[in-house]
Each structure stands twice: as C-alpha cells, then as structure tokens.
Amino acid sequence: MATSRLQLEGDDSVHLHITHANLKSFSADARFSPQMSVEAVKEKLWKKCGTSVNSMALELYDDSGSKVAVLSDDSRPLGFFSPFDGFRLHIIDLDPSSVTTGGWLEDTSLVEKYNISEEDYAKRTDSFRKFKEKRVSQNPVAAEAKTKENYMEDLCANIKVGDRCQVEPGEKRGMVKYVGRAESLGPGYWVGIQYDEPLGKHDGMVKGTRFFECPRLQGGMVRPDKVKVGDYPERDPFEEDEI
C-alpha cells in the first residue's frame, strides 16, 4: 500500500478523487498542490460543483474509505492533512437553500414542467413540428440525403487527426483522434477526441464500434462545430482557473 502512495520524482502534487454529498452523480479526479490553502482548494471546487466557498465543508477519506481528517481550517495548507494519491475529498454543502440541496440539479422530477395538449400544440403555427413539416414538404428526398451525407462535413476541412483542440462546452482540451462519419451515433460527420483529463465517456469505442484508441474515460465523440483546433497545450493543473 505504501508503494502506491509514492509521488513521481520531482512532482509533489497529490491525486484526489472528488465527491459531493448532495450530487450523487458528481465524480471527478484532480491533482492538487499540497501547498494550496484549504480556502484555495474550495475556490477551485466551487467552480466545478456550484457549492459556495463559505458554505463548503471538506472531509478527507483514505483509500479504504475511512475518514482521516476534516479540513476545518481554511488557512492551513492541504499538505497539513497528509493527503496521498488515491484519497477522496468529500464536499458537504452547508447551505440549506443551495441549488444542490435535495437533488435539484439531478432529479428532473422535482422540476415543474410546462405541459400542452396535443390538440393545442397541433394548432400552433410557430412550433418546431410545423417548421420541420415545411422543410420536408419542400424537398423531402434532398433534405434527408443532405443530412445523412454532408452534415457538418465542411466544418471538418481544417480538423485533422493529431491536432490539438479545445471542445465546448467547458473548454475541455485534448487531441483529435478521429474525423469522419459515425453511423451508430447519427448522420453526418463527427470528431473523436482524446481529452487530456478523464472528462470523456469511453476509450474510443462507441456502441460496439472502435473509432480510436485512448485511455478509459478520456474519449469523446462530438460534432465538428464544438471543436476548435490550434495552439491549445495541455493545461498546468495548478493554473488559476483549474483544479
């Protein structure tokens, strides 16, 4: 066990798993400098989960699931609490009126929904259904063929495998690993991305088809209009706007 906790030579950062008491589906992995104050850690986490710094409590758990510390002093450096690679940093939102309370950000059944009867919707002239019916009636065959064959093909002209890129939303950075069609995902063109961090959904295989190779949870398939290629180097984990 002690061997797994050793840091890389010349690298004093620590790799922690992040969870949130109110957001059961929230999960992230990030590196922190032990020199960061607890307050600075909270500021980085606030940008990711929405819990304000003043309402955030942090608990540290070891890799066996045992609580080893409560980070109660915002002025102390993270290293004071002796975190090791693989430990878990657990966020607790102390604000009872927070948007994270009660699962509001995850449970869509809690949101009051707008309902309209089928009869009333059919009478509307400004609905998406009417717009789609009009487009199809004008040239149904050509419209369908264009969608299947050429959707966003023009946006792929300057996107090449190996390009560094930034993907929206979230300004996620990575490398282009695939450019082309992906019938299992939908008509038109897609871009396969290997993200620098585990922000993806797969390892390059989607619905039984392998489009490229990459580490688990670092792969993504997105539309070309979400991709900007250029000088987007891998971010320093200790940049101001990053965890």
Curated annotation (Swiss-Prot):
<dbReference type="Pfam" id="PF01302">
    <property type="entry name" value="CAP_GLY"/>
</dbReference>
<dbReference type="GO" id="GO:0005829">
    <property type="term" value="C:cytosol"/>
</dbReference>
<dbReference type="GO" id="GO:0007021">
    <property type="term" value="P:tubulin complex assembly"/>
</dbReference>
<feature type="domain" description="CAP-Gly">
    <location>
        <begin position="181"/>
        <end position="223"/>
    </location>
</feature>
<dbReference type="InterPro" id="IPR036859">
    <property type="entry name" value="CAP-Gly_dom_sf"/>
</dbReference>
<comment type="function">
    <text>Involved in control of cell division. Regulates probably the availability of alpha-tubulin for dimerization of alpha-/beta-tubulin, which is required for proper microtubule biogenesis. Decreased expression of TFCB results in enlarged mesophyll cells and leaf epidermal cells with bulged nuclei, increased ploidy and increased numbers of spindles and phragmoplasts.</text>
</comment>
<dbReference type="InterPro" id="IPR000938">
    <property type="entry name" value="CAP-Gly_domain"/>
</dbReference>
<dbReference type="Pfam" id="PF14560">
    <property type="entry name" value="Ubiquitin_2"/>
</dbReference>
<dbReference type="GO" id="GO:0051301">
    <property type="term" value="P:cell division"/>
</dbReference>
<protein>
    <recommendedName>
        <fullName>Tubulin-folding cofactor B</fullName>
    </recommendedName>
</protein>
<comment type="subunit">
    <text>Supercomplex made of cofactors A to E. Cofactors A and D function by capturing and stabilizing tubulin in a quasi-native conformation. Cofactor E binds to the cofactor D-tubulin complex; interaction with cofactor C then causes the release of tubulin polypeptides that are committed to the native state. Interacts with TUBA6.</text>
</comment>
<dbReference type="GO" id="GO:0009524">
    <property type="term" value="C:phragmoplast"/>
</dbReference>
<keyword id="KW-0963">Cytoplasm</keyword>
<dbReference type="GO" id="GO:0009793">
    <property type="term" value="P:embryo development ending in seed dormancy"/>
</dbReference>
<dbReference type="GO" id="GO:0043014">
    <property type="term" value="F:alpha-tubulin binding"/>
</dbReference>
<dbReference type="GO" id="GO:0005737">
    <property type="term" value="C:cytoplasm"/>
</dbReference>
<dbReference type="GO" id="GO:0007023">
    <property type="term" value="P:post-chaperonin tubulin folding pathway"/>
</dbReference>
<dbReference type="InterPro" id="IPR029071">
    <property type="entry name" value="Ubiquitin-like_domsf"/>
</dbReference>
<dbReference type="InterPro" id="IPR045172">
    <property type="entry name" value="TBCB_Ubl"/>
</dbReference>
<dbReference type="GO" id="GO:0005634">
    <property type="term" value="C:nucleus"/>
</dbReference>
<comment type="similarity">
    <text>Belongs to the TBCB family.</text>
</comment>
<dbReference type="InterPro" id="IPR000626">
    <property type="entry name" value="Ubiquitin-like_dom"/>
</dbReference>
<keyword id="KW-0143">Chaperone</keyword>
